[in-house]
Every structure is written in structure tokens, then in C-alpha cells.
Amino acid sequence: MVFSRFFRVTGVNLSRRVYSRISSSSSPSLESIPWIHKASNFTLYGSFHASSVETQVSANDASQDAERICKILTKFTDSKVETLLNEASVKLSPALIEEVLKKLSNAGVLALSVFKWAENQKGFKHTTSNYNALIESLGKIKQFKLIWSLVDDMKAKKLLSKETFALISRRYARARKVKEAIGAFHKMEEFGFKMESSDFNRMLDTLSKSRNVGDAQKVFDKMKKKRFEPDIKSYTILLEGWGQELNLLRVDEVNREMKDEGFEPDVVAYGIIINAHCKAKKYEEAIRFFNEMEQRNCKPSPHIFCSLINGLGSEKKLNDALEFFERSKSSGFPLEAPTYNALVGAYCWSQRMEDAYKTVDEMRLKGVGPNARTYDIILHHLIRMQRSKEAYEVYQTMSCEPTVSTYEIMVRMFCNKERLDMAIKIWDEMKGKGVLPGMHMFSSLITALCHENKLDEACEYFNEMLDVGIRPPGHMFSRLKQTLLDEGRKDKVTDLVVKMDRLRKTQLVG
């Protein structure tokens, strides 16, 4: 059986802290759950979850030290951040701080603390990349006043770049502040930069990718041939934006205008058009554009094959998906992980898990994976098919490091199964590796804790969420407040509301 070849036997040890946390809860202990106990006897070509792996040395010292710092910072609720960092005993460098700030991109308050700590170390100077990483993190919690203060600081230190303004614009756009997003690009001229066609395209791209393609189209129509001459990239950005909205009528209009202006679709434009039709489930049209591209001697890219395999596979048109996979093999491009992942997904949609596992074996033989995305696809489909036992086995035996997305899938699965002890076990594994949870993972766990009436624990995680600077979604906060009120804990609700208002209104100080 292919599934049995997918694994080899090993033992999996629980840390004493995690085990005591699970066994002390009202739920049964880990060993009392038959399918989980069985699952712990498998591993996939070397597990990254066993405690012995923690002694492995990373090839990149900065990356290794950054991971260690993030692990230390998960304890920040018990100590001051500065104290923890002073005790970290790492070799400080701009590259290290940049790596840490990127890992803290979902924790703006922590990121700012690390930035300020490094700045106060003797002889240390931040780079443009460090500032940009902090701006990205602060933008996620809408600390725009502080961000512009950092821009002034960068200007004084001659560290400003056009990338800085693009980052700020993107954060405004994702906060649905379209006027400010456009203004951020124009503001670069106030700081001595000349706005060029590439910046115009970047503005369009920022708006389009934040689901504001209508505004991007207005900017395009207003500015074309007045300040900027659009090029084929300008049109492909709009094609992609309208494609994301599944507005094929506008995709067709932009395509026609592009041709009228003398720009024939290139492989990028065709890829976007084909992907848009696949997402809209217009597969005959997608294939028609594919054939048109080949007739024009425009060679399909691996991305185009991925779009078709993904789309056809999701509609359980497995034979058609397999045909395009075979065509991709003979296209002249080496097969890469995304193409294999598309095939894995196609098999999963048709519930042919044996073939999905065979594909993973082939990826390994070819040296192109599997990667975390491969496992995320398999886990998603196993959970969709109510095969939780198998999903946990696959998770335990991953041959690469899980990403925050992988952890989120597993935490959500156990929350939905009302196995909070296991959800918290996965959570602790993740934080033990220096990976910080995002908003959706906090929301899943807190909502599940409310459902189980574990309100003290729910409040504990809610406070942790606020402490790192993550704003909770409204529906989750409402659920927590109502559950507390139902239990007569009005004082606790008042405390949380005050803390939420403080996070919402308080501007961090740089």
C-alpha cells in the first residue's frame, strides 16, 4: 500500500510541559485516544517534530539566531522584552534584526520593541531593509502616524527608498484607505524621488492586489497619456485585478484595449487571462486561450500549466488535468514543486489519495519537494473528507518545517473536533519553534474555548493577541463578550473593552 510506504516507524516524545498541560485538562490524555496514539508511531522520512531535531544547526547563522530570538520572545508576557533580548547572547547584525522583524510581521508591538532595543545597542545602525520590515509590521496594525515618523527618520539618515513608499501604500490599500494609498506614492516626490512609469505600474498593482481594481482602473484612465505612457505591464496588472474579481467582461475589455494600443498579449498576459477563466470555471474558454497562445508561437509557462491543472482538478476533470500535466512535462521547462502540487491537489479533489502520495514520492525522487504547501494541500483535503486521523499522521510525519498556514490548518481541525488539548499541543509546538500565530489562528482557538466555556483560557489568549498588537476580528470579540456576559462576568468584559479601545486608539511611540 502506497500510504504505508509514505511513512516509517519512529517514536514521538512530548515535552513535559506540553504533556502536563494536556493531561491536566478535563479531556482524556493523549495515550487514551486510540487513533492519535497510533498516529504517533509514524514519521515521514524524518520528522521535524521530534525533540532531537532542535539540536540541528541551520546553514544560516542569522536565520538560526532569529529563530532563537523569536522563541525567547514567546515568553515576553512574563518578562520585559529588553531583558529577554539582553539575555539572548546573539551576535547582533542588521541582517539578524531584519530576519527577526520579518518573523514578527504579524506582531507589530513586539517588532517595534525589538527595533528600539537594537537601536540602543552600542555601534548598531539600522538599514533601509530593517526600517521597511518594521513599517510592514506596523502597517498591519494601522500605526500610520508612527510609520510617517519613521519615514522622516529614514530621510534624515539617507535611508529612504521607493520601496518604502510602496510598502506604505500597500498597507493603506489593504486597510481600504484608497485615497491615502494613492497619496503615499505621490508623496515620494515630496521626499525628492521622481515618479516614473515603473512607479505608476506599482501603484496600479498595489490597488489591484488589495481588491481595489476599480480604483486602479480609475487611476489608469485618469493618468494614462497625461503623466505616463502605459506599457504592456500596466495592462496585465489590470487584467489580473479584474480576473481576481472574476469580472471576465472587464478582462475582455482590457484585453481589447491593450491590443488596440498595439500590445499583443505575451506569456504573462495569457497566463493571467487563462487563470481568470479557470477561477471563473470557464474551462473551455481557458483552453481556447491556451490554444490561441500556442498558435501564436507563445510558449506556455509552468504557471499556465499550474492554473489549468488546478482548475480542472478542482472540478474533478482529472483526465484533463493529467493531460496538461503530461504536456507540461514535454514543454521543455523542468518540473517544479508548484506543478507537482497542482497535480497533488487534482488527485485529492478526486479522492485518489494513493495517487497523491505517489506524486509526493515522485517529487522526492526528483528533488523538488515536497514543501509545506504540498502538505497543506493534502491536509486540507483529508480534513474535508473527514479523515482527521490520517491528517494528523501526515502532519506528524512532515519532512519539511510546517509554516504558520500548516499550524493553522491543524489547530482549526482540532478546534472543530472539540479537541482543545490537541489544538493547544499544536499551538505550543509552533511557538516552541519561534513561529507566532496570526489573527485567524487566535480567532479559531478563542472561539473554540468559548464554545467549551473555558473562559479564563479564552481571555488569556485574547490578551496575548492584544499584547502582540493583533486586532481581533469583530465577530470573535462579540462572541467572547457575550459568553462572558452569559456567565455573569461583566467586569471582565469591561476590562477587555478598555484594553481593546486602548489598542484601537493609542498611537505607539517610536
UniProtKB/Swiss-Prot annotation:
UniProt keyword annotation of Thylakoid present: no
Segment annotated as transit peptide: 1-14
PPR repeats: 127-157, 161-195, 196-230, 231-265, 266-300, 301-335, 336-370, 371-401, 403-437, 438-472
Keyword annotations from UniProtKB, A to Z: Mitochondrion, Repeat, Transit peptide
Gene3D superfamilies named in the record: Tetratricopeptide repeat domain
InterPro entries attached to this UniProt entry: Mito_RNA_Proc_CCM1, Pentatricopeptide_rpt, TPR-like_helical_dom_sf
GO cellular component entries: mitochondrion
SUPFAM superfamilies cross-referenced by the UniProt entry: HCP-like
Protein name (Swiss-Prot/TrEMBL): Pentatricopeptide repeat-containing protein At1g71060, mitochondrial
Keyword Repeat included in the entry's annotation: yes
Subcellular location: Mitochondrion
Pfam families: PPR (PF01535), PPR_2 (PF13041)
Record family assignment: Belongs to the PPR family. P subfamily.
Stored PANTHER family: MITOCHONDRIAL GROUP I INTRON SPLICING FACTOR CCM1-RELATED (PTHR47934:SF6), PENTATRICOPEPTIDE REPEAT-CONTAINING PROTEIN PET309, MITOCHONDRIAL (PTHR47934)
NCBIfam families, A to Z: PPR
